[in-house]
Amino acid sequence: MAFTAISLFLAALGVINTAFAQSAVIGPVTDLDIINAEVNLDGFPRQAVLAGGTFPGPLIKGNKGDNFRINVHDFLYNETMDVTTTIHWHGIFQRHTNWADGPAFVTQCPIAPGNSFLYNFTVPNQAGTFWYHSHEGLQYCDGLRGPFVVYDPEDPHRDLYDVDDESTVITLADWYHEAASLIVPPADPDSVLINGRGRQANDTTSPLAVINVEYGKRYRIRLISVSCDPYFNFTIDGHNFTIIEADGENTDPLPGVDQIQIFAAQRYSFILDANQPIDNYWIRVIPEQVGANGTAATPPGLAVLHYLGAPPFDPKANASQVPISVNPLLEQNLHALGATGVPDLDPSCAECNITLDFTFNTPLFFVNGVTYKSPTVPVLLQILNGSFTAQDLMPEGSVYTLPRNKTIQINMPGGVLGIPHPLHLHGHSFSVIRSANSDETNLYNPVRRDTVSIGTNGSFVAIRFTTDNPGPWFLHCHIDFHLAAGFAVVMAEDPMDVPGYVKPIPPAWDKLCPIYDALPANEQILQPEAANLSTYPQK
């Protein structure tokens, strides 16, 4: 992304560009070119992998019930990063279209350079805030990530806000100055980007994102963490929030929140009431990322909330000040809108109550004693070829088969490495019946979402969902460096019914694997050197 000379000049004077342009808006039927290009997002130029040529990628939007037809074209060539690609539409259930879910070697083979693949899926019963990203190797850390919003013309919260459009979408990202495959974890980002703009350490001139508001109006802000690693504490000076959505699921309005802790891949919608004196206010994003030497290694992310009529200058408040929260968002205080209780477990179903024990043994993560290694044949293709049991499905020990139309509970103790990990389940949202920072179980009205932090030492998280969507669904840590080190399993839901449920599978899907397998080794997915995964500090 190039900035004009006048933008840089104004930034040097502490002048904000109130005409800040949002990324392009496309969809629901569109082409999406995946390219290599140089970007300068924080004062440091580097080559990146970009969707639509921008970071973040263009906002893909549609309405509840729409058919999305997104034709992804792979124009990648820079072999310091992956040149094959896949796209995951994070939070979309993909009912009957598991083949379009995106994770490499779970539901498809990667798209080879010079080739295209049409992702064709509908969202009949979903609306909310989602995102999309590469789901192979560490590619999304190199730039392939963007927002995805499904609007609901009959939104039950519609009377709470006046504005909800592309100008109210905020993405939070970590950014690195070298290719992800070369980074040695724990990965200290060089900067935090808000809507694709930020400043590296000691930089005071790179342009910042500006969110424009008008006094007296109410805005639905859609906050998306497209983070590859750290979680963030998000605040806006002088303003509180009313939370109305978590991960594409409506919540009872929760007012008075002054800080949102948001983990990689999570999303929140909140109402911002522009009721403060006309001025400019800092939007602050503090990364919870501690370097290997035990000191904070990444500068805070900054953007500007600009009221119409305020002078075009930086906010007067100290930009380096760390806000003190009085009423931070706590997950257990969120409740699903219209909740009617959580289904009971079937005591006769042994495979319906699963405990996943997470451990780390340099350089790999293990789930119940097994580290995830991608198979050479996608799990979906294995099922379509007649493998239906956990014993038959690869990778060995990492596939759990689940019966259909059952309530499943997954129990996840926290504390591995002493840090919180965001766990994401594909194909479903789930009820968080016990949150990481709570010792209470809520079976009446827990929040529903698709990505949950399992917390630190002593935490215990439990989730429940119903197996009403046959297919192999990835469950993994959304810290991408941890996924690359084996922090994942596959939940194979009702494998025997998958061939009849997941259809029609397009002929182009069948061609992905032969084309990928014919690629030379240097064009297949880059694997981080084992040494790059061996330096996580035990805390």
Swiss-Prot record:
Residues noted as binding Cu cation 2 in the record, renumbered to the chain: 90, 133, 478
Location of the protein in the cell: Secreted
Record-level Gene Ontology MF annotations: copper ion binding; oxidoreductase activity, acting on diphenols and related substances as donors, oxygen as acceptor
Activity regulation statement: Inhibited by chloride ions. Inhibited by citrate. Inhibited by oxalate. Activated by acetate.
Disulfide bond annotation, renumbered to this chain: 109-513, 141-228
Cofactor(s) it depends on: Cu cation
Top EC group: oxidoreductase
Carbohydrate attachment residues: 78, 120, 202, 233, 240, 293, 318, 353, 385, 405, 457, 532
Binding site for Cu cation 3: 135, 426, 476
InterPro entries referenced in this protein's UniProt entry, alphabetically: Cu-oxidase-like_N, Cu-oxidase_2nd, Cu-oxidase_C, Cu-oxidase_fam, Cu_oxidase_CS, Cupredoxin
Catalytic activity of the protein: 4 hydroquinone + O2 = 4 benzosemiquinone + 2 H2O
Family of this protein: Belongs to the multicopper oxidase family.
Cited function: In vitro, has activity towards 2,2'-azino-bis(3-ethylbenzthiazoline-6-sulfonic acid) (ABTS), 2,6-dimethoxy-phenol, and guaiacol. Although brown rot fungi preferentially degrade hemicellulose and cellulose, the enzyme may contribute to generating small amounts of lignin breakdown products required for catalytic reactions.
Protein's name in the database: Laccase-1
Organism: Fomitopsis schrenkii (Brown rot fungus)
